[in-house]
UniProtKB/Swiss-Prot annotation:
Its EC number is 3.4.24.-. The keyword Transmembrane helix does not apply. Belongs to the peptidase M16 family. The lineage of its organism: Eukaryota, Viridiplantae, Streptophyta, Embryophyta, Tracheophyta. It is an enzyme of class 3 (hydrolase). This is Insulin-degrading enzyme-like 2. Binds 1 zinc ion per subunit. Its cofactor is Zn(2+). It comes from the Eukaryota. Zn(2+) binds at H71, H75, E152. GO terms for cellular component: cytoplasm. It comes from Arabidopsis thaliana (Mouse-ear cress). Gene3D superfamilies: Metalloenzyme, LuxS/M16 peptidase-like.
C-alpha cells in the first residue's frame, strides 16, 4: 500500500532534501557569511517569484508592559527603509507589479513574505531585504501604525475564536509567556507606556536591534532562474543583515500547573450555539514528528465513521461536529484538543458526552496502538505528499521557511506531514496523558449569560471556573449511555492505482462531450499537470429551489441532510484524499468531487443513490433544523463590512432572499414539509456537468450516463427534464445611469462599535475590452486606496478595493470598516480619493501607463498551478453561461491594443466623480458609536441621488441586465 520513494531527493549542502517524486523543481541549501540559512528553489515554469523570511522571535518575547510589540514591529517594517525611504513604497511596488505581500506574528516566530511577477523580482527582493538591514521607523508612522494595530484588535473583539483562545491563555501560569495578550492595542502600545514614561518607538528599535539577527532567520527564495544565479542574487542582497549571534529564545515548561488542570470553565460566546472544548497538556509531537503520536490519536478520536465517538453522539442527537488533534504546540509544550459542537440536547447532556469521550479514550487504551492503522495513515500521507498539487509560490515559501528552524534539512519540504516510524510506546505515552487528572474543559454557551462571576480582561469574555476531580469524570463515565464504541474499519478508499491514463485528446479548452434533455457534459482532459487526480462538478438546476424563502430554506435543509446521511461513508473517502461537497447553487444544488481519481466514481455513485433514495428522518431533521436556525441567527453577528456586502448583494441580485425572511420561514417548517417538497424539487431537473483530469472520455460519459439512469430513466424516474421556459438564470439589477444610490442601515449587532461602507460602482456587462480597462483601473488604484485610506487617514484596518462580477455584470467595490469614522465620512473620503486618482491618471506618463499594462498582462498570463485552479476558471464560465474559455487570451489581446487616452476616457465616462455614465451604490452600516450620524448623513443626500428605503421595492422598480446564460 505504500508509495515508492524513488527520485524523491534533491541535493542540499547538508545532505539530501526529500521532495515529491513528481516535483521537477531544484533545491539548494546555503548559509551566508552572516549565518543566514537559505533555501533556494528554481522553478523554470513559474510565472510568479516569491520569498519568505521567518524570524525566530514572536509575541512570547514581548517586553513586560508592551504587549503586542513583536506584532507592532511586523507592521512597522512595511513602511520604509533608508534605501527606499518613500512610505509604503514596498507594498506599492509589489502591488503594481502583480504581486501580494503579507506577514504574521505567532508566539515564537514572525514571518514576512511576498510574491511578484518574475521580471520584477530583483528589485522586490532588494526592497524586502532592507526590512532586515536598515528599516526606517519614523515617529509619525509609529503613531499611525499603533492605530492600525488597535483597529485590528477592535475587529477581533467580537470574534469567539479570538476570545476563547485568550481565555485559555488567561487561565494559565502568569509567569509563562503563553499567558500574555499577544496582538497589542492602543492601551498596551501607547497609553500605558506613556503613563509609565516609556517611549514605544525607542523600545521598538531596541527590540529590533536585540532580536532581529541573521543567525535566527530562515529565508526561502523561489525563483525562475537557475540556482547559481539565484544564489548570487541572495548573497548580494541579504549579506548586509547583521548577525549579533542571538540564540533562538526558549520558553521551557508547560503553561499549566496543577492549579490550571482539572477545571471546568463556563464561558459566554457572542454567537448562538454551544461548544465543548477539552484540552490536555501533552508531550509535543514535534520531537517525534515521524512517529506522529498526536496525528494518530487525532485521526481516531476525530473519526466520523460508524462506531466512532462522533457517530455515537450524532445518533444520540447531541453533536453536529467533532474535531481532534494537537493545538497550540511549540518545541517545549503542546495541547491535545477535542472540540465538539453541541446541539441544544447535547448541551443538556454535557456530562454524558464527556463520559463517552473518556470511554473512547479507554477503548484506545485497551486496544493498544495498531500497526495497520498507522500503516493506513502513512500510506495516505505518502500518497498526498508525492502527488501533491503545486500551490502558489508564496504559500509554498511560507510553509518551508517556517519549517526550517524546526526540522532537519532533509524534511524541510515535508515537515511533519509524512508519518513513517511506527513506535507504539511514543503514541502510548501521549495517550496516557489524555487522562482525567490532566484535563481542562471549556464549555461555551449563551445559556450561561448571567451565571458567570469573572471577566477575561482583554476581550471581556464572561466566564466562571470550578474545579473537578478524576472521580467526577469517573462518575460521568459510569452514568453515560451504553453505546458500542469501536475502532474504524479499514479504509476502502485509499488509492492504490496512481497510473496516468493514455489521454489521446489534447483539448486545451473544455469540449461539449455529451448533451441530452437531462444533462450536459463538459470534458477537459489533463494536458498540464499529470497527476492521478480528477475534478468533477455537477450543478442540479432545479427551478423550485430558490423560488421563495420557504423553498430556499427547504433546499438548504435538503442539502444539509444529504451530507448528514452520507457522512459516515464519505468520511473515509475524505480521509483518503478524495474531497467532496454538496452546497446550494444559484438555481439548485451542486456536487463537487476532487482528488485521486482511482475510486472517485464509487463515491459519486453513492451520492447519486442517496439523492435517489432520499427520505426525511424526523430526528435528523430536527437536529439539522436547529443547526441551520443558529446559522441564520448568527448572521446578526457578522462584521459590519460583511453585512454591508450582503445588503449590496440584496440590491443587485434578482433571486436571493433576506436572511431575516428565511429565518422566519424556517421557524414554521417541519419534517413533513420537507418530505413533500423534495419530490417536487427534483421533479424537474437539468444536470450541468464538468469532468476534468485523469479521466478518459468514455469514463466521463459513463459517469453522467449513470446519473441519468438512476434519476431520469429508471422505471420510476425521480427527475424529468426541464421545460424550455424553466431554464432560469440569476439576473442583476441595473442601477440608474448618472445616479448615486444610498442605502442606510443600523448594524445588526448593537454591541459592535465598528461601522462599514461598501462603495460600489457598476460599470458594464461582460465584454473583453471593457473588462480589461476595469481590471487596469483596479490594479493601479488598489495600492493608492490602501495607502491613502488606511495608512494615511487611518480609517480602518479593513480597507480594500476589488473587482466585482455579479453574474457577468462587472464593477468595483471599495470596502472599509472603521471604529473611528462613520460611513458618511468614509464615503466622502472615497470620493476624495477618486478625485486624487483623476489627477494621477491625467498626469501619468506613457511609460508608466505601458508598465502598468505590461504588469496586468503578466498577471493575467499567470499559469494555473494545479487542476483545481484550472477547473475553477472553466466552471465559472460554464455556470455564468459565458462559455468564453479563451477569455484570458482575448482580454490580453484587448490590453495590448489599449491606448492611454482610451483608458482615461473610460475612467472619465464610468468611474470618476460625477462621470456621465456612472452608476454608484453606497451601502452604509452604522455601528453603535456612529448611529447619531445616520440621520444627518441622510439629510445631506443631494436631490439628484436616490435613497433606497426598501430594497425589495427598489429592486422591483429597476430594469435587469440581460442574462448571459441562454
Amino acid at each position: 500500500m505504500a508509495v515508492g520513494m524513488e527520485n524523491a531527493t534533491a541535493s542540499g549542502e547538508c545532505g539530501e532534501i526529500l521532495k515529491p517524486r513528481t516535483d521537477k523543481r531544484e533545491y539548494r541549501r546555503i548559509v551566508l557569511k552572516n549565518s543566514l540559512e537559505v533555501l533556494l528553489i528554481s522553478d523554470p515554469e513559474t510565472d510568479k517569484c516569491a520569498a519568505s523570511m521567518n524570524v525566530s522571535v514572536g509575541s512570547f518575547t514581548d517586553p513586560e508592559g508592551l504587549e503586542g510589540l513583536a506584532h507592532f514591529l511586523e507592521h512597522m517594517l512595511f513602511y520604509a527603509s533608508e534605501k527606499y525611504p518613500e512610505e509604503d513604497s514596498y507594498s506599492k511596488y509589489i502591488t503594481e507589479h502583480g504581486g501580494s505581500t503579507n506577514a504574521y506574528t505567532s508566539s515564537e516566530d514572525t514571518n514576512y513574505h511576498f510574491d511578484i511577477n518574475t521580471d520584477s523580482f530583483y528589485e522586490a527582493l532588494d526592497r524586502f531585504a532592507q526590512f532586515f538591514i536598515q528599516p526606517l521607523m519614523s515617529t509619525d508612522a509609529t503613531m499611525r501604525e499603533i492605530k492600525a494595530v488597535d483597529s485590528e484588535h477592535q475587529n477581533n473583539l467580537l470574534s469567539d475564536s479570538w476570545r476563547m483562545a485568550q481565555l485559555q491563555k488567561h487561565l494559565s501560569r502568569e509567569d509563562h509567556p503563553y499567558h500574555k495578550f499577544s496582538t497589542g492595542n492602543m492601551d498596551t502600545l501607547h497609553v500605558r507606556p506613556e503613563e509609565n514614561g516609556v517611549d514605544t518607538r525607542s523600545e521598538l528599535i531596541k527590540f529590533y536591534d536585540e532580536h532581529y539577527s541573521a543567525n535566527i532567520m530562515h529565508l526561502v527564495v523561489y525563483g525562475k532562474e537557475n540556482l547559481d544565479k539565484t544564489q548570487g542574487l541572495v548573497e548580494a542582497l541579504f549579506q548586509g543583515i547583521r548577525n549579533t549571534n542571538q540564540g533562538i529564545p526558549r520558553f521551557p515548561g508547560q503553561p499549566c500547573t496543577l492549579d490550571h488542570l482539572q477545571v471546568l470553565v463556563k464561558a459566554v460566546p457572542i454567537m448562538q450555539g454551544h461548544e465543548l472544548s477539552v484540552s490536555w497538556p501533552v508531550t509535543p509531537s514535534i520531537s517525534h514528528y515521524e512517529e506522529a503520536p498526536c496525528r494518530y490519536l487525532g485521526d481516531l478520536i476525530g473519526h466520523e465513521g460508524e462506531g466512532s465517538l462522533f457517530h455515537a453522539l450524532k445518533i444520540l442527537g447531541w453533536a453536529t461536529g467533532l474535531y481532534a488533534g494537537e493545538a497550540d504546540w511549540s518545541m517545549e509544550y503542546s495541547f491535545f484538543n477535542v472540540s465538539i459542537d453541541l446541539t441544544d440536547a447535547g448541551h443538556e447532556h454535557m456530562q454524558d458526552i464527556l463520559g463517552l469521550l473518556f470511554e473512547y479514550i479507554k477503548v484506545l487504551q485497551q486496544s493498544g496502538v495498531s500497526q495497520w492503522i498507522f500503516d493506513e495513515l502513512s500510506a495516505i500521507c505518502e500518497a498526498e505528499f508525492h502527488y501533491q498539487a503545486k500551490i502558489d509560490p508564496i504559500s509554498y515559501a511560507v510553509d518551508i521557511s517556517s519549517n526550517m528552524k524546526i526540522y532537519p534539512t532533509k524534511h524541510w519540504l515535508v515537515g511533519s506531514s509524512l508519518p513513517s516510524k511506527f513506535n507504539p510506546a511514543i503514541v502510548q505515552k501521549v495517550l496516557d496523558e489524555l487522562s482525567p487528572n490532566n484535563v481542562r474543559i471549556f464549555w461555551e454557551s449563551n445559556k450561561f449569560e448571567g451565571q458567570t462571576d469573572k471577566v477575561e480582561p482583554w476581550y471581556n469574555t464572561a466566564y466562571s471556573l470550578e474545579k473537578i476531580t478524576k472521580f467526577t469524570i469517573q462518575e460521568w463515565m459510569q452514568s453515560a449511555p451504553d453505546v458500542n464504541l469501536l475502532l474504524p474499519t479499514p479504509n476502502v478508499f485509499i488509492p492504490t492505482d496512481f497510473s496516468l491514463k493514455d489521454l489521446k485528446d489534447k483539448d486545451i479548452f473544455p469540449v461539449l462531450l455529451r448533451k441530452t434533455s437531462y444533462s450536459r457534459l463538459w470534458y477537459k482532459p489533463d494536458t498540464k499537470f499529470f497527476k492521478p487526480k480528477a475534478y468533477v462538478k455537477m450543478d442540479f438546476n432545479c427551478p423550485l429551489a430558490v423560488s421563495s424563502p420557504d423553498a430556499a430554506v427547504l433546499s438548504d435543509i435538503f442539502v444539509w441532510l444529504l451530507v448528514d446521511y452520507l457522512n459516515e461513508y464519505a468520511y473515509y473517502a475524505q480521509a483518503a484524499g478524495l474531497d467532496y461537497g454538496l452546497s446550494l447553487s444559484d438555481n439548485g444544488f451542486e456536487l463537487s468531487l476532487a482528488g485521486f481519481n482511482h475510486k472517485l466514481r464509487i463515491l459519486l455513485e453513492a451520492v447519486i443513490q442517496k439523492i435517489a433514495k432520499f427520505e426525511v428522518k424526523p430526528d435528523r431533521f430536527s437536529v439539522i433544523k436547529e443547526t441551520v436556525t443558529k446559522a441564520y441567527q448568527n448572521n446578526k453577528f457578522q462584521q459590519p463590512h460583511e453585512q454591508a456586502t450582503n445588503y449590496c448583494s440584496l440590491v443587485l441580485q434578482d433571486q436571493i432572499w433576506p436572511w431575516t425572511e428565511e429565518l422566519d420561514a424556517l421557524s414554521h417548517l417541519e419534517a413533513e414539509d420537507l418530505a413533500n417538497f423534495v419530490p417536487m424539487l427534483l421533479s424537474r431537473t437539468f444536470v450541468e456537468c464538468y469532468i476534468a483530469g485523469n479521466v478518459e472520455k468514455d469514463e466521463a460519459e459513463s459517469m453522467v450516463k449513470h446519473i441519468e439512469d438512476v434519476l431520469f430513466t429508471d422505471s420510476k424516474p425521480i427527475c424529468r427534464p426541464l421545460f424550455p421556459s424553466q431554464f432560469l438564470t440569476n439576473r442583476v439589477t441595473e442601477l440608474g445611469t448618472g445616479m448615486k444610490h444610498f442605502y442606510y442601515q443600523e448594524g445588526s449587532n448593537s454591541s459592535d462599535e465598528n461601522s462599514a461602507l461598501v462603495h460600489y460602482i457598476q460599470v458594464h456587462k461582460d465584454e473583453f475590452s471593457m473588462n480589461s480597462k476595469l481590471q487596469l483601473f483596479e490594479l493601479i488604484a488598489k495600492q493608492d486606496t490602501f495607502h491613502q485610506l488606511r495608512t494615511i487617514e487611518q480609517l480602518g484596518y479593513i480597507t480594500s478595493l476589488s473587482l466585482s462580477n455579479d453574474s457577468g455584470v462587472y464593477g468595483v467595490q471599495f470596502i472599509i470598516q472603521s471604529s473611528v469614522k462613520g460611513p458618511g465620512h468614509i464615503d466622502s473620503r472615497v470620493e476624495s480619493l477618486l478625485k486624487d486618482l483623476e489627477s494621477k491618471f491625467y498626469n501619468m506618463s506613457d511609460e508608466e501607463f505601458k508598465s502598468n499594462v505590461t504588469n496586468l498582462i503578466d498577471m493575467k498570463l499567470e499559469k494555473d498551478k494545479n487542476l483545481d485552479e484550472e477547473s475553477w476558471f472553466y466552471w465559472a464560465e460554464i455556470q455564468t453561461g459565458t462559455l468564453k474559455f479563451n477569455r484570458i487570451d482575448a482580454e490580453v489581446a484587448a490590453l495590448r491594443l489599449l491606448k492611454k487616452d482610451e483608458w482615461i476616457d473610460f475612467f472619465d465616462e464610468y468611474i470618476k466623480v460625477d462621470a456621465p455614465n456612472k452608476k454608484s451604490l453606497s451601502i452604509c452600516v452604522y455601528g453603535n458609536q456612529h448611529l447619531k450620524e445616520m440621520r444627518n448623513d441622510k439629510d445631506k443626500i443631494p436631490s439628484t441621488s436616490i435613497e433606497i428605503e426598501d430594497i425589495v421595492c427598489f429592486r422591483k422598480s429597476q430594469p435587469l441586465y440581460g442574462s448571459l446564460k441562454l
